[in-house]
């Protein structure tokens, strides 16, 4: 390093001596000489730091304990022994020899018309593998992917001769030689291996850098002991830029070098390598129109602005507009994008062209991913770092959809919105969602990969979010919808245990209803079994038909959202023999005392009818004589005229109360109580009627006594009802009793 730096110092001193001999000595030349030596010194210091870091890492790797990435010291030792024997020749002549001309042809500088490599020797030092590890996941079809930390620092005996033919306008078409006497490469290398079942068993090797590597060369023109032009301020920057572009576009992931091992080991000479340059997935069209309100940077109050941009490894620059603060360029640049996985940030800088160092007039950045979709986005951007200045741009992202249209999986994803729309239309017809619009469900398409098929033809479609039925909550008293009374065959029984609790609750809450229910029970005991069964079945059918639908479910295509209060029918059941189906719940709950008086009157009428029915039953029993000491039971097919002409509403009311009482409907239509209640059936009723009328039929005077007892019972029923209601006056009671006595006198006179 010292000898090379001394060479530069000697050159500077000679130039200064020559200028002073011409009487052109000026402080400005000394200042330029100082800047030149400073830049050269910085370049040498950077190289020295890299060499020292290399030595430190080399020693640290030798002492390091094994971790996730192994140090593979055994491999470095083996390569060090094999390298001077055969590996160096294979690397320089078989691998790099065919590849370097391709690089020179594609990335040669504009000053060179042609470039060829005449000699290449890598030196005695082999590449050093700092660490190695296996990547479990592979993005391609490689069977094995290795990540190696490589560090190659060439020895002093490295030599490479590069012949360059200059262009005629620059060097009159002369040939010159460049000597590469040093090289330093450091970075992470990815190696993908694909195996074969036949010779040579290694089908393909893919090599690339995981990230842009550090690369430095020592280039000397004409002879090997000359000046290193790679450290000169102008040439050094230009050479670094050229090498970085060459590496990033060819050997940095996702671009990689592919080696066909079958052709590589074949005896015939074939082109065994090629560069796998990944095709861009999109292009960005950047249109630079104009700028306004730029900052004056020159002494004349103007500027010479230009725009340069950078997106990844690609750069662009506009032309220079002279002496203006509102330049107009109207230039466009097309930049490729290879992947959307990494951030795509377009960095733009507006500069002022000067003779030595360009000034910065402002910077701005744009995220390209925000403008995807193929639309042209025209915008004015404010320049940062400077308080003034704006830039007029237009950005258009042109995506390459040629391949995506052929992929059936992507087609399915493109039609995802259609699938969501059809799903939403189907679910609205089900009527099970609580809102008009069904929730948006994003379907997931999971491809099923089949060995031997390049394209996937089978997917598993899964909804993105499970949609369950949302039931509307009910307010008010809860009701079990599955405890409905339905018509069943005669050999089956119905259990009405659930209704008993409702009846008990109602009886305890309202004594008026318990009194009315007792009167209806007395009248229903003396009805015929056939008529009782007919009315019972008819009431069951009518109740099942008139039963309300499921309130908590919406009907098909129903759009309103609301709450329906459910109240049991038992809470608002009929209080008289007539049906109250036409009355609404609100009307019954909001009725006043006048309505309660009408209800009390209806109870009295019901009591009167019950008394008539009891008296009519005993009168029919009195007209029959016992035969052979046995009591005769009236056949079920025989019915009286009065019984047939009884009011249907009375019968329906009585039967409905029987249906709501706790018990079971037996095969012959009788009611069988459960719990501590009395067991009542048709035979028991008939026996009770015969026992109660056995002695009365022998003597007519006993009939009169029975009628008196019935009167007393009716009076006691009336008194109990008046006490419970507290709304019946004494006049109404007297009229009612008078009507009952008149009715009894008429019946006795007719007998």
From Swiss-Prot:
Binding site for Ca(2+) 2: 298, 352, 354, 359
Regions annotated as coiled coil: 701-728
Gene3D superfamilies: C2 domain
Biased composition (Basic residues): 612-624
Localization per record: Membrane
Compositionally biased spans, kind Acidic residues: 639-651
Magnesium in keyword set: no
Domain C2: 267-381
Pfam families: C2 (PF00168)
Name the UniProt record assigns to this protein: C2 domain-containing protein At1g53590
Organism, as annotated: Arabidopsis thaliana
Gene: NTMC2T6.1
